[in-house]
Structures are given as structure tokens and as C-alpha cells.
Amino acid sequence: MSDNTPPNQGQPQQVNLQQVAQQFMAGMQRHFDMLAFNLAARECVQEEAYNARINAPKVMPAGPRHQNFEQMQAYARDLLVRQVIGDCMNLAVTGMNNAHFFLALVKATKASPQVSPEAHAEAQKSQRAFLPVQLDEKFNRLEQDYGIMCELEDSIISLGFILQALMQQGGIVKEPQLDAKGELVLELKTVEILSREVDAGKAHGKLIDQRKVFKEGEALVFSDVELQLILVTIASFADSLFKSVSLYAKSVKDASDS
């Protein structure tokens, strides 16, 4: 009688890094597309349409608190900025957490595709210790435990400070967010166009850094394109991180095979 039990049934398997990375980047694109949709919708909205929608139910929860079109434009913009930066921070942390679990599995298994219960438990223990730590400590542990130097680490840290100022200080930069030079610096990834194919209408470019500097007491203001570039920067950060993780896995496997 043949054994129809699938091999390694119930046995934990190595995480598919490529699949994790693809799913993460697909999520990034959805966030980017949604932001573009919201920005386009905001450009098209008219005061008459807003007032018509306000009056459609013929009743309000608290009429004296009603805000006019200009007030709601400012409020909606502030809400959008906080949402975009908050979502970006969540995405960055999620990417780091996913990367760390893969790294922990690789280390525990010496990059074997088969994961023993003991190795899986060891990786889970490491992950439980990693999840609750502060952002700067996550970067430290990735470097100390796995030799992973994260590109754009400073940008992610700065976004954390920006979110702190938006949520706790009314969007005004204060001393806790400043560096040794008295500045809050955010480096964003943007594209420098190098050449264009006239016939195909295609542009060739490369990613470069674009600095945005805030001083103490300044309000955190971002253009529409800068909000989009924040998402591009998070995507660039994640892409670099996943590539570094892949190189780590290869180095561990090569060492194990030698």
C-alpha cells in the first residue's frame, strides 16, 4: 500500500521571500494608486457639490458645528497628510518585521528549505523579541544580528519624527524632532530624467535623493508630489531591504554548503 501522505505534512516550511516581497510591493502600489485617486478627486471637488451633499439628508448631527467648504478643504488636507505618513510608517515597520522573521528562520535553519520544529520555535522566539522594540532598535538589531545595513534608515526615522509632530504637536516641528544641526531633514527618492526616446515617448531616469528641511517652529507642509514621493521612498526602502535579506540568505547557504 502506497503512502499518500504529502511529504513534510505538518512540518513548517521556509518562508518564500520573493512572494513576501511581491505581496508587499503590490500593497505599496495600491496605496500609491489610492493616494493619486484621492488627490485627483480633491482637485475636482466644487463648493456647490459639497453644499449639495451637505444638504441632501435635510438634517445634520450638530448644525452649529458645521464647517464650510474652505474649512473642510483644510481639514481634509491635514487628515490626508497624517494618514499617508501614518500608513507609510506602518508599511515600513511591517516590511522590517517580515524581513526579520525570514532572517531568523534562515539563521536558525542555516538556510535549509526544511524547517524543523525546533528551528521554527527559535525563529518565533527571536521574532517575539523583535516585534515590540522601538524603530531605532529594530534597525540596530538587523545590523547587529544579521549585518543588514538599511538604506534610507535616516528617512524612516525622520518620518517617525514627522508623524510624532503631526499627531502630538499640531504639525509644528519642535526640539525633540531636531538633529544636532537644529534641523529635521527628510530625504525622499525622486527621479532624474536622463534621456527620452522621442518615438516611443519613454523616459529613462534614475532615482536620486531630494532633501526637505524643516527648522524648529516650522509647520510640516508637503506638496501633492512630495506625498507621493514619500510612498516611493518607502517602496525603495523595502526593495533595498528585501535585496539585503536575500543576499544574507545566500551567504548563509553558501557557508553551509561549503
Model features per residue range: what roles?
Residues 80, 84, 119-124:
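Hydrophobic alpha-helical segments of membrane proteins, primarily the transmembrane helices
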Residues 122-141:
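A structural motif
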Residues 120-126, 195-200:
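Short C-terminal domain-edge/linker segments immediately following a structured domain
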Residues 164:
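Aromatic/basic-lined ligand-recognition segments
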